[in-house]
């Protein structure tokens, strides 16, 4: 006999990930003193297929990403318990905070592009011709 497979609800994973991101951002902003960790922005949540684990991606301004990750992961158990109070689901995922390097790379690329477009001898963009009148 074959076992009945449960079918996941389409889009549930994305909706739950978005809700976890919103709730965590609010909890962190209201309840945790993150002055040592700089300004933290949650950039996304990735859930495992069984909803048991969540990678929470963040960016940080004004501090080292490793310091912020250590502080957030130190608070992960408490944040999990706070999420349990807010989410009405059977299993609240365990949280693991991971620095999101894509935002930082995007900023670095933007700086490089701006620098390359700046007029000057080493920029690749010719200087403006001087008015000879």
Curated annotation (Swiss-Prot):
A GO MF label: ribosomal small subunit binding
Disulfide linkage: none
Keyword terms of this UniProt record: Cytoplasm, Ribosome biogenesis
Gene Ontology biological-process annotations: maturation of SSU-rRNA
Entry-linked Gene3D superfamilies: 3.30.300.20
Cellular location(s): Cytoplasm
GO cellular component terms, semicolon-separated: cytosol
SUPFAM superfamilies: Ribosome-binding factor A, RbfA
Keyword Transcription regulation applies: no
InterPro entries xrefs: KH_dom-like_a/b (IPR015946), RbfA (IPR000238), RbfA_dom_sf (IPR023799)
Pfam families, sorted: RBFA (PF02033)
Family according to the record: Belongs to the RbfA family.
Primary role: One of several proteins that assist in the late maturation steps of the functional core of the 30S ribosomal subunit. Associates with free 30S ribosomal subunits (but not with 30S subunits that are part of 70S ribosomes or polysomes). Required for efficient processing of 16S rRNA. May interact with the 5'-terminal helix region of 16S rRNA.
Cross-referenced NCBIfam families: rbfA
Subunit structure: Monomer. Binds 30S ribosomal subunits, but not 50S ribosomal subunits or 70S ribosomes.
Protein name, UniProt field: Ribosome-binding factor A
């Amino acid at each position: 006999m074959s076992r009945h497979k449960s079918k996941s609800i389409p889009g549930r994973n994305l909706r739950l990930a978005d809700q976890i991101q919103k709730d965590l951002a609010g909890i962190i902003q209201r309840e945790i003193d993150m002055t040592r960790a700089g300004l933290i922005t949650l950039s996304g949540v990735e859930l495992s297929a069984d909803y048991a684990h969540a990678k929470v991606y963040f960016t940080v301004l004004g501090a080292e990403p490793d310091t912020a990750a250590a502080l957030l992961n130190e608070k992960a158990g408490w944040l999990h318990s706070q999420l349990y109070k807010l989410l009405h689901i059977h299993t609240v995922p365990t949280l693991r905070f991971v620095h999101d390097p894509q935002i930082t790379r995007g900023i670095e690329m933007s700086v490089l592009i701006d620098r390359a477009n700046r007029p000057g001898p080493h920029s690749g963009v010719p200087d403006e011709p001087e008015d000879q009148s």
